[in-house]
Structure formats: C-alpha cells, structure tokens
Amino acid sequence: MDPVNRRLFMKAVGPASLLPALPEAAFAFQAAGPQIVNEVAAPQPDANAKPKYSIKFAVIGLDHNHILSITAAVQRGGGELVSVLNTNPANPKGLADFQARFGNVKVARNEDEILNDPAIQLVAAAPIPDQRAPLGIRVMRHGKDYLSDKPGIITLEQLADVRKTIKETGRTYAILFSERLEVKAAVKAGDLVKAGAIGKVVQTVNLAPHQVNAPSRPDWFWDPARYGGILCDIGSHQVDQFVFYTGSTVADVAASQIANVHYPSQPKFQDFGDMMVHGNGGAGYVRVDWFTPDGLGVWGDGRLFILGTEGYIELRKYVDIAGRKGGNHLLLVDKKAQRYIDCNNVTLPFGPQFVGDVVNRTHVAQDQEQALLATELVLKAQKNAKRLQFIS
C-alpha cells in the first residue's frame, strides 16, 4: 500500500483500528470508573430546637424579594416581626407579596414610627440598593442593629460613612450574603474547610450566572447608579465567599472588567463581569453574568470551587446539570477518596446565630470586618474595572 492510500485507510477506520493494541488493563479501568463515596449530610442535633433568644424587629424596604428570605431567617432565629414599611409606592406588589408570606403584619405609617420605637432592636431592609446604606446609618444612629440585603453599600463614600457610624454607635451593620449564609451546601463547605478536610485553602473560584428575566425588572435594575454595577451587586455574594473560605483579613483586587454584551437598549447596564482578588489567606476569581438560558430551569447554575493543599471542593448550589435532582450538591476529593455529599438536610445557622449576636453584642453569624472587607473589594473592583467592547 502506497503512503497516500495508507493515510486514507487509517483516516477511514479511525481510532477503532488501534483498539487491539491497547492493554487489557486500560479497558478494565475505564469500565470500573471512579469510585465515588455517596453521603447524605445530617442536620444539627438541635435543628428543631426552640430558638434560644428572641428580639423584636421591623422591615423597611421591599424592593427585592430577598427580603422574604431575610425575614424568614430572623424569624427562625427567634425574631418577632413587629411592623413593615414599603418605601416605594411604585412597588405595591412588594407589600402584597410580603403580607401573603407573613400575614397581616402592622404596616408602619413612616420610617420614624419604626426608628423611634424603643422596643425594636433590629431593622431588616431591602429598599433600592442606593438607599440601603443611608437607611442603615439612620437605623444605627437610633440605637438599632441593621440587616441589609446585598449589595448593602454601593459606593466607597457610603462605605466610609458606614464604618464611621459603626465606630461611633457600636451597632451592627450586617449584610445577608445569601449565596453563602442561606445555601446549605455552602454551610457544609464551611464546616469542612474549618475541619481541615482539604488542608489550607489556596484559592476560591466562583461562577455566578443569573437569569435576567427582563420584563419583571424595575427601571432601577438597569442603572448602575442605583444598583452599584454588576461586580458590586451579584459580585458581592462571591467575594464574601472568597473572604470567608480563605479567612483573609487583608485583601486587594488584582484586576477587574465589565461589559454590556447583549443589551444595547440599556447602554448603562452591565451583563458580564469578572475579577481577580488576593488576600493574606488565599487567592480568588469571580465571574458574574446575566446569561442563564431558559432551558436550565432555575435562575442560575452557581458553582464554587475551593482549592486546598490536600484536596478540593466543588459546590453545585442550585442545580446539577449532570442529572442529580435539586440543589445543594457538594463534591470533595481528598487523599483518600472522591465523595459526593447531599447537603439538603444541613441546618442553616444564620438566623439563630444572628439573633444571638443582637442580644449578646457578638459577631458569630457574620464577622463585621469581613463583611465590610468583601464590600470594599467589590467597590474597588467596580470603580476600577476595565470596560470591554466586543465585536458585534
């Protein structure tokens, strides 16, 4: 057979012609596949115990439905909901949805009614993002603690004012980064990291696609001056995880970039962003976007990868496109095995811990300085981000 015909023959028969030459062991390994240990994480022994502490709290601002899970978390921890105030008359649905979830709670006449009520110890809030820090400052200056939806602060100037007020009042300015604090797989990952399951954490990688669902979005959603920009907004969830899992107390931004790829009719909007960060506890990479396709079935395929010196963890938080049902999937590889852990039974500790913090003047549920460090990082990344332009 001449060389040209030989080449044509080999191309025609393809890789199948090489199969007889492969050792039997190769087929045995491929057939056996990886041996994955399947586990189901157990709830805390006291998961159904009555809350240890109780407080009275109110809600101000209903412009993001995160306020429903924020309120529920405080109630789980022993919070008694006293009153609610809708700060946006253009959003009557916010109040209707809140009352449908929490019943016929008293509707306050105005902000002062809540701030001047000495029985109220905490205000939880989800107004339009640019209003959150000014509201939190007023709350703290009235002797109450504050729990904001993310982003809790959208400018470096607001951050400086918040830090100043915390120092002067001794009150707590908490931000509910729900993608860690209210995700069971993320809670389990924290326990594993703390126990040394993967050695020292080297890097976190967060991939956080979201679904834009444009018809449901209010005008402020498209304006970075109101919501802070994509890195400040949905990036804050992710950088909170970098700070927490690496244990960083000092950190900075190495690089950041943003783009508006798909929404020319909303020229100020940002639908893509990413950033690299580094701290005294490790490194981190974050990618955020508004490109979740309808076919996924949930709002986003959120992933977290935690690299350690002795193993790594992957979280598939809300969906597993490999076929496992539901969310809260954790995969861990260490020196001994490959493990899959179903985390749906894990107890969410934030509510009880946070109510305890309000009573005891502690920071168990969320470290105050870490929350502000995560915020500072995304604000710097947002401010200094390179604006990308792609060929249309």
Model regions and ranges:
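A contiguous active-site-proximal alpha/beta segment in oxidoreductase catalytic domains
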Residues: 153-215
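NAD(P)-dependent dehydrogenases' Rossmann-like dinucleotide-binding region
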Residues: 176-179, 195-216, 230, 234-238, ...
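C-terminal helix-rich "cap/oligomerization" subdomain common to oxidoreductases
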Residues: 12-22, 27-51, 122-124, 353-392
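N-terminal Rossmann-like dinucleotide-binding module
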Residues: 28-101
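Beta-loop-alpha module in the N-terminal Rossmann-like domain of NAD(P)-dependent dehydrogenases
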Residues: 91, 105-165
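Contiguous beta-strand/loop segments that form the cofactor/metal-binding neighborhood of enzyme cores
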Residues: 36-47, 240-320, 350-361
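N-terminal secretory signal peptides and thylakoid transit peptides that target proteins
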Residues: 1-17
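Mid-domain beta-loop-alpha active-site segment that forms a flexible
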Residues: 69, 176-184, 216-252, 269-271, ...
